[in-house]
Amino acid sequence: MVNWAAVVDAFYVELFTAHPQYQDRFAFKGVALGDLKGNAAYQTQASKTVDYITAALAGSADAAGLASRHVGRNVGAPEFTHAKACLAKACAANGAPDLGGAVDAIISHF
């Protein structure tokens, strides 16, 4: 069984290591990567990410809605393309299935 919380934690560390400027778009901006798990705002975001992954795996994810919510935050296809690469690394490192198709579904709505 995949530990999706571990996958999500690895994803965000990978994302913010590769693209540190992206962390500034979150309520936990400025929190050291090693301290993310103890930050309430990060925990909320990580939980939402796990929920989305769970929905994507069940075939009930709202890719259009997620894309729409991110447009208002000035986040689009380029950022999700970067996220896709980081998520692939996190999935591979944690024995999880590739979620590239779920990210592509989001990207298709930008």
UniProtKB/Swiss-Prot annotation:
Keywords: Heme, Iron, Metal-binding, Oxygen transport, Transport. Residues 2-110 form the Globin domain. GO terms for molecular function: heme binding; metal ion binding; oxygen binding; oxygen carrier activity. InterPro entries: Globin (IPR000971), Globin-like_sf (IPR009050), Globin/Proto (IPR012292), Mb-like_M (IPR044399). It holds the Pfam family Globin. Transmembrane segments: none annotated. Belongs to the globin family. Homotetramer. This is Body wall hemoglobin. It comes from Cerebratulus lacteus. The lineage of its organism: Eukaryota, Metazoa, Spiralia, Lophotrochozoa, Nemertea.
